């Protein structure tokens, strides 16, 4: 993996009791230069950062050590926990808009190698805890976008992907989404959380409607993680 160090001043100590168990993937919505300038700018009132920035050519830029908190998740919730910066590693992937632009093959190959290394160092990052920004902040965020190849990552052992042929879930969809990890519908409508789920697991049709196909995908994923709504 080709990598270069570009230290950002934007980080903080991790809480003593915080185990790293979440990997959050983002897209930058900016060019590589603009992204690095922003994430390494220590003069802004609201500073942001990430542990890694991944260029389109596959070059990895290391900004913040993994044992430090980077400021990438913002208001966030996953599996009953909030403020996920404290327990996560954040990767910003250079892409101007992941709903419109494909991710280059060499970039995804480098991402898989990077993620494998992160997960190897932090085995508490189980497949269900490899998430997109849109998973942990429904409606507020949409990255890494519907063109992000989650299935390719899952085939390499990174994250989850539903299996075909599952039966539709019987039961409450909101409860099932919470069981998987999504936030409760406080301040965010259930439709927005369903849309976030579809954005990740059924990107061909993101409409916020819990139709039979969506229910089947959700039911299969719950089965994979051994959860029950």
Model feature map: region roles:
Residues 74-76, 105-124, 128, 137-229:
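Cell-envelope/ECM-targeting effectors and their regulatory/trafficking segments
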Residues 1-128:
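Active-site-adjacent loop/helix surface patches within enzyme catalytic domains
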């Amino acid at each position: 993996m080709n990598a270069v160090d570009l230290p950002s001043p934007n980080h903080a100590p991790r809480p003593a009791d915080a185990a790293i168990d979440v990997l959050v993937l983002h897209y930058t919505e900016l060019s590589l230069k603009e992204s690095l300038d922003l994430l390494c700018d220590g003069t802004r009132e609201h500073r942001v950062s990430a542990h890694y920035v991944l260029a389109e050519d596959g070059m990895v830029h290391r900004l913040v050590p993994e044992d430090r908190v980077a400021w990438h998740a913002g208001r966030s919730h996953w599996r009953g926990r909030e403020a996920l910066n404290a327990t996560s590693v954040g990767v910003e992937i250079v892409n101007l808009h992941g709903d419109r632009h494909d991710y280059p093959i060499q970039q995804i190959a480098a991402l898989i190698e990077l993620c494998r290394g992160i997960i190897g160092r932090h085995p508490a990052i189980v497949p269900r805890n490899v998430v997109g920004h849109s998973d942990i902040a429904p409606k507020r965020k949409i990255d890494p976008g519907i063109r992000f190849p989650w299935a390719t990552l899952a085939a390499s052992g990174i994250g989850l992907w539903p299996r075909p042929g599952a039966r539709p879930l019987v039961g409450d969809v909101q409860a099932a989404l919470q069981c998987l990890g999504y936030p409760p519908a406080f301040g965010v409508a259930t439709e927005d959380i369903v849309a976030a789920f579809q954005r990740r697991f059924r990107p061909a049709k993101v409409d916020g409607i819990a139709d039979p196909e969506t229910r089947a995908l959700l039911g299969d994923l719950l089965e994979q993680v051994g959860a029950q709504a």
